[in-house]
């Protein structure tokens, strides 16, 4: 998940440097969503792993 977030961030930065506002905004939005989903999944796996049988 974090890999995809970093990829979208790099795409957004390159697009912003080249002046493509729409593409940069879309890639940045996708990067934010992927990052948040990754954080949520990490926290869920962290707490689910602490339970003892």
Swiss-Prot record:
Subcellular location: Cell membrane
Keywords assigned: Cell membrane, Membrane, Transmembrane, Transmembrane helix
Chief place where the protein resides: membrane
GO cellular component, one term: plasma membrane
UniProt keyword Lyase, yes or no: no
Membrane association type: Multi-pass membrane protein
Pfam families documented for this protein: DUF1328 (PF07043)
Sequence intervals crossing the membrane: 4-24, 30-48
Coiled-coil features, chain-numbered ranges: none
Record NCBIfam families: PRK13682.1-4, PRK13682.1-5
Family of this protein: Belongs to the UPF0391 family.
Protein name: UPF0391 membrane protein YtjA
Organism: Salmonella typhimurium (strain LT2 / SGSC1412 / ATCC 700720)
Gene name per UniProt: ytjA
């Amino acid at each position: 998940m974090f890999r995809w977030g970093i990829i979208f961030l790099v795409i957004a930065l390159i697009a912003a440097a080249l002046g493509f506002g729409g593409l940069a905004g879309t890639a940045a939005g996708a990067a934010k969503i992927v990052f948040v989903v990754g954080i949520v999944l990490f926290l869920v796996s962290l707490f689910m792993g602490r339970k003892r049988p």
